[in-house]
């Protein structure tokens, strides 16, 4: 006998929806970050326009960065000091907007293989310490936000720019929502870059 509610999703009673950050606040914080241009603020700028998880960004090395490519991008892959959360987390992320500007500044200042030397070395990433420091700083400008809010906003901004859900999932490394999306190689870098520039 068919179950009429078998396909109905019910959110957990105690589930808390994390707040996104408004576009206006994102732009304001990005400007502050690029003006200050220190390690922590450049990290915030990088996350704000790539949608990366904090741990993903902290674990980057310069070999992951392709600034001189026709479509500048990050090749996000697993490393011994920073594994990725899921298989779908391995992805190409175009560098646009504040993220691109932040990486250019860091590239001129680079002194080691890691982008964020204060928090990452060959033994691992100190994400907890970094998260606490960034959240404390961010609340001065956006009281209800935390660093992970940029990831939620990334999805909202892409959706509002008319980017199809399958591409949004690929850009953010979110799990595919259908069996069909698991076939093929996904969207190419040009398509990803063009779509990501829609919200800049």
Annotate the PLM regions.
Residues 1, 65-71, 144, 163-184:
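Short, polar N-cap/turn motifs at the start of nucleic acid-interacting alpha helices
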Residues 2-60, 151:
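Basic, Lys/Arg- and aromatic-enriched nucleic-acid-binding interface segment
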Residues 26, 79, 96-143, 154:
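Active-site/catalytic core of tyrosine-dependent DNA strand-transfer enzymes
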Residues 39-40, 126, 130, 134, ...:
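Hydrophobic (often cysteine-bearing) scaffold residues that line and stabilize catalytic clefts
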Residues 45, 49, 56, 149-175, ...:
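C-terminal catalytic core of tyrosine-transesterase DNA break-rejoin enzymes
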Residues 9, 59-102:
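Conserved tyrosine-mediated DNA breakage-rejoining catalytic core shared by Y-recombinases
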Residues 12-15, 20, 121-122, 161, ...:
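Catalytic-site neighborhood detector that most strongly recognizes the C-terminal catalytic loop/helix
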Residues 40, 70, 89, 110, ...:
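Exposed loop/turn and edge beta-strand positions of beta-sandwich/beta-sheet ligand-binding modules
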């Amino acid at each position: 006998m068919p179950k009429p509610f078998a396909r109905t999703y019910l959110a957990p009673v105690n589930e808390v929806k994390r707040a996104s950050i408004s576009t206006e606040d994102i732009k304001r914080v990005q400007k502050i970050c690029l003006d200050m241009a220190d390690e922590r603020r450049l990290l915030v700028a990088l996350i704000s326009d790539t949608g990366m998880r904090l741990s993903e960004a902290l674990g980057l090395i310069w070999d992951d960065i392709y600034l001189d490519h026709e479509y500048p991008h990050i090749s996000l892959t697993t490393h011994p000091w920073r594994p990725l959360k899921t298989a779908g987390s391995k992805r190409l992320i175009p560098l646009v907007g504040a993220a691109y500007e932040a990486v250019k500044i860091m590239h001129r200042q680079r002194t080691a293989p890691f982008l964020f030397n204060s928090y990452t070395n060959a033994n691992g990433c100190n994400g907890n310490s970094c998260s606490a420091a960034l959240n404390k700083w961010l609340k001065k400008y956006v009281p209800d936000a935390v660093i992970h809010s940029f990831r939620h906003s990334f999805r909202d901004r892409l959706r509002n720019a008319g980017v199809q859900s399958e591409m949004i999932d690929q850009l953010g490394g979110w799990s595919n929502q259908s069996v069909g999306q698991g076939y093929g190689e996904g969207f190419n870098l040009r398509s990803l870059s063009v779509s990501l520039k829609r919200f800049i």
